[in-house]
From Swiss-Prot:
Protein family: In the N-terminal section; belongs to the carbohydrate kinase PfkB family. In the C-terminal section; belongs to the cytidylyltransferase family.
Biochemical pathway: Nucleotide-sugar biosynthesis; ADP-L-glycero-beta-D-manno-heptose biosynthesis; ADP-L-glycero-beta-D-manno-heptose from D-glycero-beta-D-manno-heptose 7-phosphate: step 1/4; Nucleotide-sugar biosynthesis; ADP-L-glycero-beta-D-manno-heptose biosynthesis; ADP-L-glycero-beta-D-manno-heptose from D-glycero-beta-D-manno-heptose 7-phosphate: step 3/4
Gene, per the UniProt record: hldE
Annotated stretches, region: Cytidylyltransferase: 358-486
One annotated GO molecular function: phosphotransferase activity, alcohol group as acceptor
Protein name according to UniProt: Bifunctional protein HldE
Origin species: Koribacter versatilis (strain Ellin345)
Length: 486
């Protein structure tokens, strides 16, 4: 894996936009009803969910195509749908996200839809509407014709198989052979246990459970599984196989070698859609000429990003770029962000239904009182943002002898504290503008302030947020430390 980070960043930003990926497979619509649980039903021992809002987005193969588009490339999706409102909703969503949807509509078959009911980050129930069986032969003929029509303009082909009746063996083999004639790489995300239908593909990307079922090997015996994967590479004529191993990472398996790309540490909220992000990223890597090892590394980063989100959600190009950049800098430094970067982070945290806490101050000569404040502030929510006054702002407030420690050094020290998720520097006299931009759920201030005296308190309370005053640790302050030093 010799390519440096700068080259990879350049490839993602400037090469992927010229790539075109064809996805064929089981398209779905994922629907979500979000709500709050306040009590148990008197009719049965089940929670009552009070619905607050509803969302929907592409799932299955359609989510693979969406990931490709969000990563900056062109995507075309071919698959079966019904002739219903969900088919139109799916087409509209994809079209608005620059995905060309070429669906074969089948009478008597619904558009596959999965409705999930969630409270907070907890999934309460899932309802599936589908007919997972073969369509008429004429439908398969149309599907193959449309896929072959798009193939010459494609840089890679993905077969996204959710075992819902689209990718029959004859469909897979027709498309794999056509792609091979044009030297177009074929990537398969399998759900069927019979991998022989994917013979001749460039790579198959099963998860650990899928690999165990296909190989008929005990899930707990990783060495035997990876040996079986090597046999599959040989027997199926693959270039390589990639197996997602959950917390262990992703294994890249060739005929005579296995390399494991370690998992990226992330807080896991929802694993749905991770495999879609992995194969979308891997397809773009191969289509742009990167070697498989680099492709697996990028796919690993993409999967880690997606599992940190709630629900089926694609990986964004900027998220992959940020993750790749963060690898080349210390973790603490990566937590020091600009205002625009902070707003992107806050937006992502909100999509995950995370509670955001903001505190602010000069934080000059960090001491135990500061640490106590930060640890208590973190306890009020899921993410803690620390906003610090710039050097110019500190001088305006404290005089020309301050700060003792420069803004960049103060920011780096704060970022090294585990309780802190992001540090941002503001140049204004007060953090009001930043508070209004981030709209925190909780605003925390240390000291003996009245809530009414806290900058931003009125604004935070106006949108339903809370203001918390944390008592100071007696005997510790920056001023006293300076006096003691003198």
């Amino acid at each position: 894996m010799s390519t440096n980070v700068a080259d990879l960043l350049h490839t993602i930003k400037n090469n992927w936009c010229d790539r075109s990926i064809l996805v064929v497979g089981d398209v779905m619509l994922d629907q979500y009803i979000w709500g709050d649980v306040g009590r148990i039903s008197p009719e049965a021992p089940v929670p009552i969910v009070r619905a607050t809002h509803r969302t929907e987005q592409p799932g299955g193969a359609a989510n693979v195509a969406l990931n490709i588009a969000r990563l900056g490339a062109r995507a075309t999706i071919v698959g079966f749908t019904g002739t219903d409102d969900n088919e139109r909703a799916l087409k509209d969503y994809l079209s608005s996200n620059r995905v060309e949807a070429d669906f074969v509509s089948c009478e008597g078959f619904p558009t596959i839809t999965k409705l999930r009911i969630l409270s907070g980050r907890q999934q309460m129930l899932r309802l599936d509407n589908e007919r997972a069986e073969s369509r008429p032969s004429t439908a398969y003929q149309k599907l193959i014709e449309r896929a072959l029509h798009h193939l010459p303009q494609s840089d890679a082909l993905i077969l996204s198989d959710y075992a819902k009746g689209v990718l029959l063996p004859e469909v897979c083999q027709t498309l794999i052979q056509a792609a091979a004639q044009r030297k177009i790489p074929v990537l398969v995300d399998p759900k069927n246990v019979d991998f022989s239908r994917y013979r001749g593909a460039t790579t198959i990307s099963p998860n650990l459970g899928e690999l165990a079922l296909a190989a008929r090997v005990d899930l707990e015996n990783l060495n035997d599984l990876l040996y079986a994967a090597q046999q599959m590479v040989r027997n199926l004529g693959l270039s390589f196989l990639t197996a997602t191993l959950g917390e262990k990472g992703i294994a890249l398996v060739t005929r005579d070698k296995t390399t494991i790309s370690a998992a990226v540490a992330r807080q896991v909220f929802d694993v749905s859609g991770a495999g879609d992000a992995v194969i979308a990223t891997l397809s773009l890597s191969l289509a742009s000429g990167l070697d498989p090892e680099l492709g697996v590394h990028l796919a690993n980063l993409a999967g880690a990003i997606v599992v940190s989100k709630v629900g089926t959600a694609p990986v964004e190009q900027y998220e992959l770029l940020n993750a790749l950049t963060a690898e080349s800098v210390p973790v603490a430094q990566a937590k020091v962000v600009t205002r625009s970067e902070l707003l992107e982070l806050v937006a992502r945290w909100r999509r995950n239904d995370e509670r955001i806490v903001v505190t602010n101050g000069c934080f000059d000569l960090l001491h135990v009182g500061h640490i106590s404040l930060l640890e208590q502030a973190r306890g009020f929510g899921d993410r803690l943002v620390v906003a610090i006054n710039s050097d110019r702002s500190v001088r305006e407030l404290k005089g020309n002898s301050r700060p003792i420690v420069g803004e960049q050094e103060r920011a780096r020290v704060l970022a090294a504290i585990a309780a802190v998720d992001a540090v941002v520097i503001f140049d204004e006299r007060t953090p009001l503008e930043l508070i209004e931009a981030t709209r925190p759920d909780v605003l925390v201030k240390g000291g003996d302030y009245a809530v009414s005296g806290v900058v931003g308190a009125e604004e935070v309370q106006s949108w339903g947020g809370h203001v918390k005053i944390v008592p100071i640790v007696e005997g510790f302050s920056t001023t006293k430390l300076i006096e003691k030093g003198h």
